[in-house]
Amino acid sequence: MAISKEKKNEIIAQYARHEGDTGSVEVQVAVLTWEINHLNSHIKQHKKDHATYRGLMKKIGHRRNLLAYLRRTDVNRYRELIQSLGLRR
């Protein structure tokens, strides 16, 4: 299931850097993280759903690239984001 408009707007409001911000790296990573977590729970129940697994791997790769970009450009924003999302141990 795709992310609902209400849930996406809630995530955007939480991670936006300014009013109307929908494309910053923080927002993109937060939305991707929600989608990845949702797909992970689906994959646990439907182990043979290979198409969904492939989509999950694409989203993980996209998020990894965005995080690498953010770490290269602004380390402080990167650290705040991974801490707020709980991505690293």
Swiss-Prot record:
SUPFAM superfamilies in the record: S15/NS1 RNA-binding domain
Gene Ontology cellular component annotations, sorted alphabetically: cytosolic small ribosomal subunit
Gene3D superfamilies assigned to the protein according to its UniProt record, in alphabetical order: 6.10.250.3130, S15/NS1, RNA-binding (1.10.287.10)
Pfam families reported for this sequence: Ribosomal_S15 (PF00312)
Keywords, comma-separated and alphabetical: Ribonucleoprotein, Ribosomal protein, RNA-binding, rRNA-binding
Binding partners and assembly: Part of the 30S ribosomal subunit. Forms a bridge to the 50S subunit in the 70S ribosome, contacting the 23S rRNA.
Domain of life: Bacteria
UniProt cross-references to HAMAP family, sorted A to Z: Ribosomal_uS15_B
MF term (GO), any: structural constituent of ribosome
Family, as annotated: Belongs to the universal ribosomal protein uS15 family.
Record protein name field: Small ribosomal subunit protein uS15
Function: One of the primary rRNA binding proteins, it binds directly to 16S rRNA where it helps nucleate assembly of the platform of the 30S subunit by binding and bridging several RNA helices of the 16S rRNA.
GO biological process, one term: translation
